[in-house]
Amino acid sequence: MQAIILAAGMGRRLGEFTADNTKCMLEVNGVRLIDRMLTQLSSIDLDRIIIVTGYEGEKLRKHILSCFHNLNIVFVDNPIYDRTNNIYSLWLTREYMKEEDTLLLESDLILDDSILQKAINAEYPNVALVAKYHTWMDGTMVRIDDEHNIVNFIPKKSFRYEDVPYYYKTVNVYRLRKDFCRDHYLPFLEAYIKVLGENEYYEQVLRVITLIDTANIKAVPIDARWYEIDDVQDLRIAETMFASPEDRLRKLQHSFGGYWRYPGLLDFCYLVNPYFPQKRMIDEMKANFEPLLRDYPSGMGVNSLLAGKYFGIKQKYVVVGNGAAELIKALMEELDGKLGVIYPTFEEYPNRRDNDSLVKFHPANDDFSYTADDLMAFFSDKDINSLLLVNPDNPSGNFIPFADMLRLVRWAEETNIRLIVDESFVDFSDGGFSNTLLKNDLLEALPSMCVMKSISKSYGVPGLRLGVLASADDKLIARLKKDVAIWNINSFAEFYMQIFGKYEKDYARACDLFREERANFHKELNEVSGLRVVPSQANYFLCELTGSMTAHDLALRLITDYNILIKDCTAKKGFPDGKQYIRIAIRDRKDNHALYEAFRNILR
């Protein structure tokens, strides 16, 4: 058996990264693609490896010969690489393909070590490795039947999103018998080039053979890691996928989202309602996708109107943000004097302030719990102008009930302290909507109070980036509206607010379902040895590790062995040295049980 690697392409989409080298000379985590591939091939009993070079071919040949002198490597040059595609590169190897069975690979692949053995050990004579379609995949797709026959090759121009559930992506790894190449593939390859030219793809020939039903090529599905690197984003994703466990965890944590790029990842780090929006609302959003994509959104005036309708408060009291983060930044920059903060907290607020302007309260217990009376007692003799309260708190889940909140906000009003209440998680609390301060009479009676709410978290739409701040302080609201851009909300977010009223009952039911699941999950977690669960009124649990395992080591085990991402809190401000805390989101029953089982296996 021989291997053929196609490595003539220019890799234009990679820009500066391929300015003076071909794609397979790119490094992923310090290892060149071609080095990784040749190392993997060296473990297989191959008579020779044929590499088709083209763009910057001399550099590639010199590098390979200096590093892999123990391999029998044959180079084939494609001198017209700049005006041909891989169909011509493969055609240049036709005589070799007649002589031996071939393992055919593209050079821009990064593959798990197990993948090539899948092709070598497949029971069928001719195989194409395929993977179930995911959104990152581009290029040739196939459809297969129940017996793994490839019934069609689908080129990019024939791709139909409505057929995505049936698609598999070709991994661009094939094992082809020499008789198949000699009697079927190469004659069609020659005819195809003569009729359609050299700037095509070799998969098109397989498609033609399949359509006339003379092919004997089977699909072998894989679920191991692999990636095809065509642009700089692909390069970054590949670096994350194939990083060491430690580096992979760090890269995922520093991405701050975008985890759809990593199929199968269970995200217990970010905090989103698992039960809303439901299918009917999503279908309405989909049905209006094209006009929302093509039309400009409204300005701040209309969006304030929609947000007021959304929460049942007056338009003039509301400013809408591109996520609560935009409003947090604007508000923190607006406030004068010192700010009271309860630690540990959601650090987006204090990170927007000078440390010297912060007056910090640290609850003196392992649950980080506190009451309204605790806050009034601590801050009553402190020289603060504003007090921040996240209720329920993040990350502790501590909750001050509504009656006590009223005492606290009135105390703040009487002592000339502006109280900033972030109630992004209040809908998850027992009592739900009855605990909100987003009420006209309260805002008017307590005009210095500011209420912040992230729509992303409670309502399960973080991709829309929506948040609101409400206050009856008309001068503050006017300054904040002036500070944010007129078109700070996109059309999809605006339309979501526009139609939400039709789905309010669904949202209420979703919150009820969530509270039931929180109770179930809490009961499960309490069964895990070495894990102390802090009571929570939010959509997450803060947990202390009471055994020998550190939070970092647990996070590492979960991402490595279970593809589960959690929040390691040990580096957050406000946690005592030596204590090990994690925060885990509460998802649906299936996902929560998967995490519970992982905990049981690791922490036993």
Each PLM stretch: what is its role?
Residues P277, A403, T560-D561, I566, ...:
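PLP-dependent enzyme catalytic core of the Aspartate aminotransferase-like
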Residues D112-L196:
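Conserved core of the sugar-phosphate nucleotidyltransferase
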Residues M1-L60:
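N-terminal glycine-rich phosphate-binding loop and ensuing alpha1 helix
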Residues R515, V528-Y562:
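Conserved PLP-binding catalytic core of the aspartate aminotransferase-like
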Residues F68-T140:
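Conserved beta-loop-beta/alpha segment of the NTase-like Rossmann-fold superfamily
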